Amino acid sequence: MTAWVGLTGGIGSGKSAAAQYFADLGVPRIDADAAAHSLTASDGIALPEIRRLFGDTVFDTQGLLRRDILRKEIFASPSRKALLESVMLPLIFSEIKKQQETFTDAVYGIVEIPLLTEKRQFISLIRRVLTISAPLEKRIGRVMARSGLTRGEVADIISHQASESERLLLADDVLLNDGSLKSLREKTMLLHAFYSGIFASKPTQGKHNG
């Protein structure tokens, strides 16, 4: 039975880079954001309900979801955000579970869930939580460099996410990503050895009993 580690962290923490390093080591990787994207891609199963709830204005003439418009709408309205989540979260949960069932021989796998702290229902899918942590200024700088967003825009996004202390309270394990990519890779390799050891001997190891 494959044990699953939930990998999470705030924007700019380096969680996707860490998840990729695990994958490079042969660890099964499931990405909640990628699952969400597939559900809302052309002919995605979430589209009919999104159209029913949000109307035609969030779709283009080809029937494709206008993600930028939908993003602005839910960012401006907590109730609209909750409405979208009522559609998406159960579908994402089911998709992750379906993907997990395709891996039966691996000792452990990684599920990258950015909003794990905010959406605790996903904890039932995992055994341990790995939080990728980084100093605030480094996070802001990384996001600005890759996105072109202003400092204020990045800070606004961070303010709408769970706090670092909330993520750390949920964590079984913490990886501090305060250096280079080489350092991050080395820390990931150490965690890989740790997880391979504990899950080989005790597949249910961890305070989260997914």
From Swiss-Prot:
GO CC annotation, single: cytoplasm
Broad class of the protein's primary localization: cytoplasm
SUPFAM superfamilies in alphabetical order: P-loop containing nucleoside triphosphate hydrolases
Disulfide bonds: none
MF terms in GO: ATP binding; dephospho-CoA kinase activity
Enzyme class label: transferase
DPCK domain span: 4-202
Coiled-coil region(s): none
Catalytic activity of the protein: 3'-dephospho-CoA + ATP = ADP + CoA + H(+)
EC number: 2.7.1.24
Subcellular location field: Cytoplasm
Keywords, in A-Z order: ATP-binding, Coenzyme A biosynthesis, Cytoplasm, Kinase, Nucleotide-binding, Transferase
UniProt keyword S-adenosyl-L-methionine, yes or no: no
InterPro entries reported in the protein's UniProt record: Depp_CoAkinase, P-loop_NTPase
Keyword Ligase: no
Pathway info: Cofactor biosynthesis; coenzyme A biosynthesis; CoA from (R)-pantothenate: step 5/5
Residues the record lists as binding ATP: 12-17
Biological process per Gene Ontology, one example term: coenzyme A biosynthetic process
Family assignment from sequence similarity: Belongs to the CoaE family.
Function: Catalyzes the phosphorylation of the 3'-hydroxyl group of dephosphocoenzyme A to form coenzyme A.
Name of this protein: Dephospho-CoA kinase
Organism for this UniProt entry: Neisseria gonorrhoeae (strain ATCC 700825 / FA 1090)
Classification of source organism: Bacteria, Pseudomonadati, Pseudomonadota, Betaproteobacteria, Neisseriales
